């Protein structure tokens, strides 16, 4: 019993000493809160900031804080696509564009139907002029040029060849063809010209030979009405001649109009 009471009395004594600690007996040393508050800066700073604030110069050169990228949500619009709408009205036609390059030639089409016959045309006027004459007598050169005359007519349409002068006179402006055939004389030259008006155009020539031969010459000439064409034997500066006889015709002169031209 004594022991119990003694312990109780001891507990009361310890309580008296501990109460000042519990209720905060004032002391001269600062409390924990006062100590922390005294060390805090006047301005609010983050724990990672440096102790000294940046000077204005340092502020200009300071690296800006990292900017977080903007995050935009992606929406799959295809899942929101609706049904196809009706066709809208046509717009105003634009200006015509530039002409393009010519395309390639297409394939040939099918043959069309036969057309109707046209009205009859006016009758065309056809002009003719032709002659062919021959000589059955031989001829020798003389002191002057000799006009070759003919004694046989094969063709002479409209009498354009004058048998008296041995000349063909052109009735129309156009292109004409002429040909001359002769038989040379043994041991003599054959020297003959086809002459247009008074100008020798072409020559028919054969050298002297012990054998006689046939020679020919031809030419085309443009003529106007009144022009004349004839055959001339060269004068006696050379021993010259052409052969023929009464049995056969060795010498012929022919010509005809190829194409008439408008006057």
Curated annotation (Swiss-Prot):
Protein name: Complement C1q tumor necrosis factor-related protein 6
GO molecular function ontology, one term from the record: identical protein binding
Region (Disordered): 80-123
Record domain Collagen-like: where: 82-123
Residue ranges of every copy of the C1q domain listed in the record: 124-263
Signal peptide interval: 1-24
Localization terms from the record: Secreted
Annotated keywords: Collagen, Glycoprotein, Secreted, Signal
Glycosylation: residue positions: 76
InterPro entries linked: C1q_dom, Collagen, Collagen/C1q_domain, Tumour_necrosis_fac-like_dom
GO CC terms: collagen trimer; cytoplasm; extracellular space; protein-containing complex
SMART domains on file: C1Q
Transmembrane annotation, as ranges: none
């Amino acid at each position: 019993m004594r022991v119990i009471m003694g312990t109780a009395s001891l507990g009361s004594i310890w309580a008296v000493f501990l109460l000042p600690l519990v209720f905060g007996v004032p002391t001269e040393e600062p409390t924990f809160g006062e100590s922390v508050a005294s060390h805090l800066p006047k301005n609010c700073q983050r724990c990672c900031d440096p102790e000294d604030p940046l000077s204005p110069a340092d502020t200009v050169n300071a690296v800006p804080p990292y900017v977080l990228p903007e995050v935009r949500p992606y929406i799959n619009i295809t899942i929101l696509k609706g049904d196809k709408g009706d066709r809208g009205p046509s717009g105003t036609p634009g200006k015509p564009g530039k002409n393009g390059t010519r395309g390639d030639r297409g394939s040939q089409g099918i043959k069309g139907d036969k057309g109707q016959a046209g009205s009859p045309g006016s009758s065309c006027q056809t002009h003719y002029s032709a002659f062919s004459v021959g000589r059955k007598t031989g001829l020798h050169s003389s002191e002057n040029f000799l006009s070759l005359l003919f004694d046989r007519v094969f063709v002479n349409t409209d009498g354009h060849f004058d048998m008296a002068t041995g000349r063909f006179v052109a009735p129309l402006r156009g292109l004409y063809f002429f040909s001359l055939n002769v038989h040379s004389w043994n041991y003599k030259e054959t020297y003959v010209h086809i002459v247009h008006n008074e100008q020798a155009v072409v020559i028919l020539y054969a050298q002297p030979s012990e054998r006689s031969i046939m020679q020919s010459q031809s030419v085309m000439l443009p003529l106007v009405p009144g022009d004349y064409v004839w055959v001339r034997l060269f004068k006696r500066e050379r021993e010259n001649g052409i052969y023929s006889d009464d049995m056969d015709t060795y010498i012929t002169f022919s010509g005809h109009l190829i194409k008439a031209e408008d006057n």
